[in-house]
């Protein structure tokens, strides 16, 4: 009786749940925002990204969006980033809100991700001044 229960317990504790893995996507992006690493963030971009930074809004290619994000980090060097809110209940959609502290101000970063094939890609990235 103990062996089957032990097997079931080990089976569920040894394999991370998809819920845990989903949270890591936004956590990893938060770490990249803290480091100001536009290249690593852009690696998660879809082929086209709706990018809203402060008052500029448009749809850009992956390469263009990376350059715009790099320019943002040059103008606003990051100091700290933390996850404020995370929605990961839909298996094909992720949404996270980060608080980004920079040397020149505090921003609210909203990240919308959609699943394509077996990976999540950023389809919308919004960086707005935190009020």
PLM features: residue spans?
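Surface-exposed, charged secondary-structure patches
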Residues: 67-105
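Sec-dependent N-terminal signal peptides
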Residues: 4-14
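Short, well-ordered alpha-helical segments enriched in acidic and aromatic residues
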Residues: 37-48
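Short beta-strand edge/turn micro-motifs at domain boundaries
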Residues: 106-131
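A short gly/proline-enriched turn/hairpin at secondary-structure junctions
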Residues: 51-58
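Extracytoplasmic
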Residues: 44-46, 91-95, 106-108, 120
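Short, aromatic-enriched amphipathic alpha-helices that serve as compact interaction elements
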Residues: 21-37
């Amino acid at each position: 009786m103990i062996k089957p229960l032990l097997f079931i317990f080990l089976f569920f504790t040894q394999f991370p749940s998809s819920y845990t893995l989903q949270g890591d996507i936004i956590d990893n992006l938060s770490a990249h925002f803290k480091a100001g690493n536009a290249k690593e963030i852009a690696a998660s971009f879809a082929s086209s990204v709706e990018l809203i930074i402060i008052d500029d809004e448009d749809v850009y290619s992956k390469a263009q969006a990376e350059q715009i994000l790099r320019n943002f980090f040059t103008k606003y060097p990051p100091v700290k980033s933390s996850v404020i809110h995370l929605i990961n209940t839909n298996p094909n959609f992720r949404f996270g809100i980060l608080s980004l502290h920079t040397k020149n101000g505090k921003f609210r970063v909203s990240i919308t991700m959609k699943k394509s094939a077996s990976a999540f890609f950023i389809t919308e990235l919004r960086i707005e001044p935190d009020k």
